């Protein structure tokens, strides 16, 4: 299971109201969905080859593997708590 990722920021983009970054971690590219606040900060900074470290929640579904990235462990834990509520995230 992936718990956190640290690596070079390659790109960031949005698709269908979802925000993503691509992180190069020792030659592997990880596509991670991120919060809007972090996306806006990256957009404002506009630095390439910036080192990014994120806490990761890996969700495995029948048809996909999803990585959700957070800038703090507290954000990640809050996300996990929300997912435990019946009907949320299904």
For the regions a protein language model found, what residue spans apply to each?
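Structure-specific DNA junction-binding interface
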Residues: 1-84
């Amino acid at each position: 299971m992936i718990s956190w990722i640290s690596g070079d920021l390659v790109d960031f983009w949005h698709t269908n109201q979802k925000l993503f970054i691509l992180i190069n971690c020792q030659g592997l590219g990880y596509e991670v969905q991120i919060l809007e606040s972090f996306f806006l900060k990256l957009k404002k900074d506009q630095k390439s080859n910036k080192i990014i470290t994120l806490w990761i929640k890996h969700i495995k579904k029948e048809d996909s593997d999803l990585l959700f990235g957070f800038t703090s462990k507290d954000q990640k834990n809050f996300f996990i708590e929300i997912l435990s509520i019946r009907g949320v995230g299904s």
